[in-house]
Amino acid sequence: MSGSDYLQNILIRKACCSETERLNQYNLVKGRLMPIINQWSNGYLEEVFQSGSSAKGTAIKGKSDVDVFISIKSSCDVTLQKIYETLGEAVRQAGYNIRHQNVSIGLKVGNIDVDLVPGKKDPGNTNYHKLYVSKKQSWMQTNVKLQIQNIKNSHRAKFIQLTKIWRDCHRLAFPSMNIELIVLEALRGYSYDTSLTDGFLQVLRYIEDKILDSYLIDPGNSGNIISDDMTFQDKLAVQQKARNSLSQQYWSSVVW
């Protein structure tokens, strides 16, 4: 079996379902949760749309299956923290077990893992939103639709998925958005037909060479420095694992 065949089998086994299946899951979740969201939002709901890795086509098994972005109108005078907290409480009162995450509320709808991400839309004709960041008890501004389009237009989903799987195999603290942006930088100028082995090796080489001083900017807001989400120790651990992976003789020792 060639290296690319091995990596393709990993993707078949661990990457998430097709775009049609993801959309079907999203519509099922949306149908179950919209009555709760509509009542909670009290007339201030702007829109709801699929977001995160499920919308980007980069999801892997074992993580959130469906990400739902909940856009609240700019005219709502409730604070971002209150929006975040009351959404969680509304879902909990509806009978779901919830998890408070950094910018999202995690829950299960049947056997589907769901992340709900509430944000308040900026005034005017814009897709920019402000999100509550619970770990910092602060907020951030971003453009989720632009983030999604940036990844979908890159045609690098398979390499992003492989890098996520590699991260999980080695239990690294390597946030998904960092992975997305590093893969895009690593493969800048490479053909879309680049083989899985050549492309993934280039990603690992880039991580080894660049991650310690990488400067990754949120495509949805240049003021958000995504690389700051990792500590130096986390970056060092990822760099060392990339170096170790590049020294392995067999792909089965790198990702499985």
Predicted regions and their residues:
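Conserved catalytic core of two-metal-ion nucleotidyltransferases
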Residues: 37-40, 62, 84-125
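Extracellular/secreted glycoprotein ectodomains characterized by long, lumenal stretches
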Residues: 3, 49-50, 55, 60, ...
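Generic non-transmembrane alpha-helical segments
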Residues: 32-43, 86-94, 162, 166, ...
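Glycine-rich, often proline-containing surface loops adjacent to acidic residues and nearby aromatics
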Residues: 64-71, 140-142
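Conserved nucleotidyltransferase catalytic core and NTase-mimicking acidic/glycine-rich helix/loop elements
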Residues: 157-256
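N-terminal regions immediately upstream of nucleotidyltransferase
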Residues: 1-49, 53-63, 76-78
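A broadly used, surface-exposed interaction patch
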Residues: 69-89
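Glycine- and acidic-residue-rich phosphate-binding/metal-coordinating active-site segment common to enzymes
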Residues: 100-101, 110-161
